Curated annotation (Swiss-Prot):
One Gene Ontology biological process: translation
Cross-referenced NCBIfam families: PRK00595.1, rpmG_bact
Family, similarity comment: Belongs to the bacterial ribosomal protein bL33 family.
GO MF annotation terms: structural constituent of ribosome
Taxonomy, superkingdom: Bacteria
Keywords associated with the record: Ribonucleoprotein, Ribosomal protein
Gene (UniProt): rpmG2
Pfam families per the UniProt record, alphabetical: Ribosomal_L33
Name of the molecule in the record: Large ribosomal subunit protein bL33B
Gene3D superfamilies: Ribosomal protein L33
Keyword Ribonucleoprotein: yes
Length: 56
């Protein structure tokens, strides 16, 4: 049963578009968001909010 939940909600990495290499790790629901995830989050290396894109 646990295998089914990991397929539906895989662990993904959100990589900074500022080019710093900083990443966030999160889960997403494939049924609700089948496209690649793009979130605006804080990058502590450049000390500002930048877009983080899903890297598989």
């Amino acid at each position: 049963m646990a295998k089914k939940t990991t397929q539906l909600r895989p662990i993904i990495k959100l990589r900074s578009t500022a080019g710093t290499g900083y990443t966030y790790v999160t889960r997403k629901n494939r049924r609700n968001t089948p496209d690649r995830l793009v979130l605006k989050k804080f990058d502590p290396i450049v000390r500002r909010h930048v877009e983080f894109k899903e890297a598989r």
